[in-house]
């Protein structure tokens, strides 16, 4: 009996221990870089250079009067980032706008651009101006935006002109009128007719009107990016 116990203990004691298992290897996965959309950071200037195009490189007959490059705008001074009278848009939007111009020309009409791509710094300057002149209502009422589709190169402010005189058609209010009179539907007579002409021509090529501003149209592309590249 004693021998059996000893043997039993020996069996237990001498039994080989199970091999030590290494802890499972944890694979580390690099975090994906943040997608740069209109809600995140500004894209590098090199990216802007590859995606933005001068509208007149698609159709040189489009007239450009970039108001924010001059003192002829609601702030009374040129805005930061506007160093030249060149209207830029995303290439897709610039191409579509050239088609609008081509559609209008047989009717003796053309486009005149007041603003296209807008550097982020210019938008921030507009917001700062509203604070200096105590006009927060312009932000809350939707006339000035702290984040604008102009920063994406996907918005354009424009009107119709007669050709070859380049005379602007009657639209009821000047560009950048901050009142209900500028709402696209708030016009009658000749102004209403001309606003509808512009709207129909722009919508035919994929642009969408902002109903509080008869002059403001937007275009859509997948994964839009914000830019701050100066206009030069």
Feature map (PLM): residue ranges:
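Segments that shape or occlude catalytic/ligand-binding pockets
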Residues: 119
